C-alpha cells in the first residue's frame, strides 16, 4: 500500500488521474490538496481518503506546509498537476537539490519555456513547428505588425493559461482592438496565423531524454462551445483516438529541437495541442508540462500514462514502462464527454449512422 498526494484536486485532470489510481490500486491511500476550499474533488464520494486546503503555491508557507504533510502522512510520491505548481516545484528542486517527495516532472528550464506560449514561440521561431507568431501586450499592441506580418484572419490567445483563455479568431484590426479592450485584464497575448484544419492532441512520456511512449487523438467538438467566442473551451465533447504515426513523429522532432536549443533533456509528461493548416500541415499551438485532461479516458482504451508514471515513481526508473513511441489503439475508438457525467467510450462512429 502506498500513500499518494495529488495536488490541484479541484481540477478536471487531477480528478481524472485520481480516478485511475483508485481503479488500478484500490488499496492505495490518496490525499488530495487544493488552495480552493470549494474544490469539487474534496467532496466526490470515493475519490479521496483525505483532503486538505493548502496555501497557494506562490505563498511562502506553501512548501513548509507540503513538507509537514509529507512527513506527517508518510506520503510516498505525488502527482503535481497545476502548471503554476510544477514551476514552483522545479524551482524548489533547483534550490534544494531534491523534491519534497518523489515526483515525475521535467526541469524548470523546459517547464518555464513551454508554459509561456510567447517564450515557446520565440524558441520555435522560423521552424516548421509553429505558425507565424508574434507577442503583443496591452502596452504594445503592435497593430501594424499584426496587420502586415500576420494578416487576417488571425488567432489570438493569452500567453499563459489553459482552456483557450483569451482566444478568438480575429477578422480585422477593429476586432483586434476591441478584443484587447474586452480582455484588458490579460497583459500579454500571442497572435498567429489562423489555422483552419483539425485540432489534434498528443500525450508523450520522456525519461531522461528518451522518448518512451506517445499516443494521439483529435478534438473534434468542444463542451459548451457556444459559450466561448472562440468556440474553444478546452474540454473536448467528442474526440477520435488516432493511429497516425506522423503526429507522434512531428511532436518528438519538436521536443528534440527544444532539447538542443535549451541544452536540457526532456523528462516527464508532455502534452501537445496542434492545429492543421488548410493543407494538413501540423503546427504546435501549445505544449503542456503535465498530463492532459484526456489522460483518464486514454487509460481506458489501453494508453495508461498514469500507471506508467506510478511505475516510474515507485521504481525510480522506467524499466517497467512499455516502449511504445507510436502507440496504436486496438480499435477506432471515439469518446463523448460532457459536464457532470463520466466520459463514454464507443468502438467507432458507425453508431451515428
Feature locations, PLM:
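Short beta-strand-to-turn element immediately C-terminal to the catalytic PLP-Schiff-base lysine
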Residues: 136, 167-172, 205-207
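Short glycine-enriched loops at secondary-structure junctions
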Residues: 34-38, 83-85, 210-211, 217-221, ...
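ATP-dependent carboxylate/phosphate-activation module, predominantly the ATP-grasp catalytic core
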Residues: 193-199, 203-259, 288-313
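A conserved helix-loop-beta module that forms one wall/lid of the active-site cleft
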Residues: 96-166
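ATP-binding N-terminal substructure of ATP-dependent carboxylate-amine bond-forming enzymes
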Residues: 1-105
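ATP-dependent carboxylate activation and anion-phosphoryl transfer catalytic cores
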Residues: 73, 245-353
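Short amphipathic alpha-helix with an adjacent loop that forms part of the alpha/beta core around
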Residues: 62-72, 143-149, 180-182
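Conserved ATP-binding module of the ATP-grasp superfamily
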Residues: 130-131, 153-155, 165-198, 256-262
Amino acid at each position: 500500500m502506498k500513500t499518494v498526494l495529488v495536488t490541484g484536486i479541484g481540477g478536471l485532470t487531477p480528478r481524472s488521474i485520481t480516478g485511475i489510481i483508485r481503479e488500478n490500486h484500490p488499496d492505495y491511500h490518496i490525499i488530495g490538496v487544493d488552495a480552493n476550499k470549494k474544490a469539487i474533488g474534496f467532496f466526490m464520494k470515493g475519490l479521496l481518503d483525505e483532503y486538505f486546503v493548502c496555501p497557494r503555491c506562490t505563498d511562502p508557507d506553501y512548501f513548509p506546509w507540503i513538507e509537514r504533510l509529507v512527513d506527517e502522512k508518510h506520503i510516498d510520491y505525488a502527482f503535481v498537476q497545476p502548471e503554476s505548481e510544477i514551476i514552483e516545484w522545479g524551482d524548489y528542486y533547483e534550490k534544494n537539490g531534491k523534491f519534497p517527495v518523489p515526483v515525475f516532472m521535467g526541469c524548470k528550464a523546459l517547464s518555464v519555456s513551454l508554459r509561456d506560449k510567447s517564450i515557446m514561440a520565440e524558441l520555435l521561431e522560423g521552424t516548421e513547428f509553429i505558425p507565424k507568431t508574434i507577442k503583443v501586450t496591452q502596452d504594445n499592441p503592435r497593430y501594424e505588425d499584426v496587420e502586415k506580418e500576420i494578416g487576417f484572419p488571425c488567432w489570438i490567445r493569452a500567453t499563459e493559461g489553459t482552456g483557450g483563455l483569451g482566444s478568438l479568431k480575429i477578422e480585422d484590426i477593429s476586432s483586434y482592438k476591441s478584443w484587447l479592450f474586452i480582455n484588458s485584464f490579460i497583459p500579454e497575448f500571442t497572435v498567429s496565423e489562423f489555422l483552419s484544419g483539425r485540432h489534434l492532441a498528443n500525450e508523450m512520456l520522456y525519461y531522461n531524454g528518451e522518448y518512451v511512449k506517445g499516443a494521439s487523438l483529435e478534438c473534434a467538438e468542444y463542451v459548451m462551445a457556444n459559450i466561448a467566442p472562440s468556440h474553444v473551451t478546452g474540454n473536448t465533447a467528442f474526440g477520435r483516438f488516432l493511429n497516425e504515426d506522423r503526429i507522434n513523429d512531428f511532436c518528438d522532432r519538436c521536443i528534440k529541437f527544444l532539447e538542443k536549443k535549451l541544452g536540457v533533456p526532456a523528462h516527464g509528461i508532455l502534452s501537445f495541442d496542434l492545429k492543421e493548416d488548410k493543407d494538413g500541415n501540423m503546427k504546435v499551438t501549445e505544449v503542456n508540462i503535465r498530463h492532459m485532461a484526456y489522460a483518464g479516458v486514454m487509460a481506458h482504451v489501453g494508453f495508461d500514462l498514469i500507471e506508467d508514471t506510478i511505475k516510474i515513481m515507485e521504481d525510480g526508473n522506467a524499466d517497467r514502462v512499455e516502449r511504445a513511441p507510436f502507440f496504436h489503439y486496438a480499435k477506432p475508438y471515439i469518446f463523448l464527454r460532457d459536464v457532470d457525467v463520466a466520459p463514454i467510450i464507443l468502438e467507432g462512429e458507425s453508431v451515428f449512422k
